[in-house]
């Protein structure tokens, strides 16, 4: 029997029915007062979500495009930058920097381990000539389920005084507290298919006054991703290029849902679902790839010693129409990843865990008591 696909991956994430209905509406003109009024509300709600009074700009890109825009608008060829790399996406920002002729110094950690703030401190404190122009980190490393210590790393950047802090918040914004103004974050990039609860296609970049000062002298080439164009257009509640109108209508809907729930409730929900998922995996005797103290609220990576992770994922899809994410690069077939990001309910978590128990038993992983995973998650949810 055909079942309803359950997306339990870190993106694209499930889309609420209200947003699906918004996507199905007849398009409106993007140079009309109707669109401008809607965009004005969306922009204000984006500032609410980012906890900022500064600009939050919308681009027709994925999260990668948003991060690239967040780099190239504020830097010049040959600029020295520090890039934290402890997973697939940290590695990507190293590659982007190299592609644009930046002097990239990677500060690395093993996949599954958090970045060490002290390593950033050492580099920044030694930079007495203030040659480091930016520090770029991935807040929630989607490939491993690790949350990096943004607060600690940012504090060292602030002590440096000159470098910008540029943050990939693609799977943390909307799941974890990212108070842009309170932390003084210069550039924060994210994507629509994550905590925003709509399909891929929109990227978001918040920009501080300090970053706009750097923009004035930045010399890396840009046209479509020139944030200055977006800033001027956004001030008039319009866009520099044709936007994905219906995606923005859907975003208007989901941001309204988020405001109704409230930031603290959103963060609490993601933390609760993370804890339930991790408790279940421990009860099923499946090793967690990230330690509790650095676990992302958006995704849980699970190791599968003695089993092929892709067989688990395949059987979950075949038997229960539940999609789990796989490992990337050298972690391929060695881990699976459970997304608990955006429009995911406690019921979804319980359904996923119950289905996983069946699959594990079918694959011969029997060193757990039947129902142990569900019971462990239920205890978290009942508190």
Curated annotation (Swiss-Prot):
Q: Which domain of life is it from?
A: Bacteria
**Is-annotated flag, keyword Cytoplasm?**
yes
- Predominant location of this chain? cytoplasm
Q: Name one GO molecular function term.
A: L-serine-pyruvate transaminase activity
Q: Which residues carry this modification: N6-(pyridoxal phosphate)lysine?
A: 194
Enzyme Commission number, as recorded: 1.12.-.-
- Keywords associated with the record: Cytoplasm, Oxidoreductase, Pyridoxal phosphate
Q: Does the keyword Isomerase apply?
A: no
Instruction: Kindly list the places in or outside the cell where this protein is found, as annotated in its UniProt entry.
Output: Cytoplasm
Q: Name the enzyme's class.
A: oxidoreductase
GO cellular component terms attached to this protein's record: cytoplasm
Under InterPro entries, the record lists:
Aminotrans_V_dom, Aminotrans_V_PyrdxlP_BS, PyrdxlP-dep_Trfase, PyrdxlP-dep_Trfase_major, PyrdxlP-dep_Trfase_small, SP_NH2Trfase/AEP_transaminase
What processes does the entry annotate via GO biological process terms? glycine biosynthetic process, by transamination of glyoxylate
Report the Pfam families cross-referenced here.
Aminotran_5
Cofactor(s) needed by this chain: pyridoxal 5'-phosphate
Q: What does this protein do?
A: Soluble hydrogenase catalyzes both production and consumption of hydrogen from suitable artificial electron donors or acceptors. This subunit catalyzes the tritium-exchange activity.
Quaternary structure annotation from Swiss-Prot or TrEMBL: Heterodimer of a large and a small subunit.
State the similarity comment: Belongs to the class-V pyridoxal-phosphate-dependent aminotransferase family.
Q: What is this protein called?
A: Soluble hydrogenase 42 kDa subunit
């Amino acid at each position: 029997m055909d079942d309803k696909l359950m997306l339990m991956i870190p993106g694209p994430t499930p889309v609420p029915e209200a947003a699906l209905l918004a996507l199905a509406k007849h398009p409106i003109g993007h140079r009309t007062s109707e669109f401008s009024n809607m965009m004005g509300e969306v922009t204000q709600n984006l500032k609410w979500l980012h906890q900022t009074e500064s600009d939050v700009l919308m681009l027709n890109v994925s999260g990668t495009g948003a991060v690239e825009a967040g780099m190239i608008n504020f830097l010049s060829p040959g600029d020295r930058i520090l890039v934290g790399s402890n997973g697939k996406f940290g590695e990507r920002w190293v590659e982007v920097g190299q592609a644009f002729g930046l002097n990239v110094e990677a500060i690395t950690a093993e996949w599954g381990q958090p970045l060490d703030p002290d390593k950033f401190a050492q580099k920044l404190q030694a930079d007495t000539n203030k040659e480091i122009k930016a520090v770029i980190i991935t807040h929630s490393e989607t490939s491993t389920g690790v949350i990096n210590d943004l607060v600690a790393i940012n504090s060292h950047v602030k002590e440096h005084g000159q470098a910008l802090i540029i943050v990939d918040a693609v799977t943390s914004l909307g799941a974890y507290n990212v108070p842009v103004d309170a932390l003084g974050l210069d550039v924060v990039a994210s994507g629509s298919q994550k905590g925003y609860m709509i399909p891929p296609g929109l990227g978001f970049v918040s920009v501080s006054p300090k970053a706009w000062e750097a923009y004035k002298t930045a010399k890396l080439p840009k046209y479509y991703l020139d944030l200055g164009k977006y800033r001027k257009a956004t001030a008039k509640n319009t866009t520099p290029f044709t936007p994905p109108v219906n995606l923005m209508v859907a975003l208007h809907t989901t941001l309204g849902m988020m405001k109704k729930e409230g930031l603290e409730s959103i963060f609490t929900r993601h933390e609760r679902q993370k804890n339930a998922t991790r408790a279940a995996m421990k009860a099923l005797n499946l090793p967690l790839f990230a330690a509790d103290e650095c676990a992302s609220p958006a995704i849980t990576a699970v190791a599968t010693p003695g089993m092929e992770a892709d067989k688990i994922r395949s059987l979950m899809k075949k038997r229960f129409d539940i999609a789990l994410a796989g490992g990337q690069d050298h972690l391929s077939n060695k881990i699976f990843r459970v997304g608990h990001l955006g429009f995911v309910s406690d019921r979804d978590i319980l359904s996923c865990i119950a289905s996983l128990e069946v699959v594990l038993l079918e694959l011969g992983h029997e060193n757990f008591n039947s129902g142990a995973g569900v019971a462990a998650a239920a205890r978290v949810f009942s508190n």
